[in-house]
Amino acid sequence: MLVRAPRLVIAGLAGDSGKTLLAAGLARLLTSRGLAVAPYKKGPDYIDAGWLGAAARRPGRNLDTFLMTPAAIGEGLARGGRADLALVEGNRGLYDGLDAQGTHSTAELAKLVHAPVVLVVDVTKATRTVAAMILGCRAMDGAVDLAGVVLNRVGSARHERVVREAVAGAGGPPVLGAIPRLGCDPFPGRHLGLLTAAEHPERELALEQAAEIVARHVDVEALIALARSAPEAAFPDRAPVAPVAPAKIAVLRDEALSFYYPENLEALEEAGAELTFVSPLAARELPEVDAVYIGGGFPEVHAERLAAGAAFRRDLREAAAAGLPVYAECGGLMYLGKELLTGGASHPMAGILDLTIEQTAGPRGHGYVSARVEAENPWFERGTALRGHEFHYSRVVGGGDRSGAVLRLDRGTGLGEGRDGIAVGNVWASYLHLHALGTPGWAPAVVALAGAGRNGISGRATVSGRAR
């Protein structure tokens, strides 16, 4: 597979350096000029990808070398569709990865996709030292095409001039912009990162402000020229996935549960599923479907409203008890439990699983996960290796269904004590988020199980072997 679209990676020295401001602002600015921008987030983060998608007015996608093979990365780029520019926002610092060698870093991804890198540098209370940091990044790996720099949080015109002169005098890459300190951040955050684009009350205003900042303070034409300088990138071809069976799957999606990779939904459809979207905050009953898919999100923020939907919770609980396949991740796990403890109050949830889940002040699980299936279940064959990620501020504090965990974690927190993945009947619930490009057998297995139930067959999944 050959990828020819212009490509650009926006990286930083660290988290909170200003990458999202530049990437989202640039995506919105170019989109408003009539260019088609395919936005990507390096890593598994849903929220940043959502903002990039909102900025570009098309789905924001993820690229991750831990979750995906090079062939899957190529397919991920191809799934962005025909575009005038593929824009990748990095995560953390340019060389920060899984270990001291920077494995699975933004730099590694930039080399794989053959894209020039623009480094966003927070220059707060620094001048010539900025040049040293930039040159250090360039010297760290000569195979990384560090092609330009954008200064962020510049204090004054003099500050900008001194930093520019220091970088140029040291032989650094061109400085392509200087964003001043802002009175307020257009992208506010909360415990899992940014406020989601779907929930931001003034999302469009925030994106237009970001676009205006980029237009005013960054050499946009130079960034476009860099993207167009990216050479063709060759990737191995992936085997196509044939449709499994017709099935109707309900996806529970609204403000409470909004974390779904576009590729996961597309993979389900390609495997034969017809998707119908249902809001657990608004619906009173579950439509006639063959399975339910529940992603992550912020059920703790909307716990009172979820609890108020007693009729829908009862309908879902009765359907699961009758054997309806239900697949849930993270926030979905929390919703399937008996009760959710948050803010000093207890809120009844769906009650499909005997679990009491408590919202915590700090993260209980955050990062990549490596797991292996150790027990029989309808979803994954025993011995299957899975790779995904977790990010949750909650823990299971009670309930008998904890003993039904079928995943052994080689990396990650999950339910605790090295376990995750509760399988009860045809219900699967875990803190583990899977990406369809990293686990290509997942979608066919979900659709097969759903289709088997439709036809009155005792279905079993077909996910087996290694996830990658």
Which stretches of residues belong to each language-model region?
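Structural motif
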Residues: 9, 87-89, 118, 150, ...
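Internal gly/pro-rich beta-alpha loop/helix module
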Residues: 127-241
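Residues that mark the start of a beta-strand
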Residues: 7, 35-36, 246-248, 274, ...
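C-terminal and late-domain segments of enzyme folds
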Residues: 110, 243-245, 257-267, 274-275, ...
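Beta-strand->loop->alpha-helix junctions that form or flank phosphate-binding loops
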Residues: 41-42, 173-183, 274-281
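Phosphate-binding active sites in nucleotide-utilizing proteins
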Residues: 247-321
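ATP-dependent carboxylate-amine ligase catalytic core
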Residues: 2-113, 117, 121-148, 157-161
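Cysteine-nucleophile active-site neighborhood
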Residues: 299-379
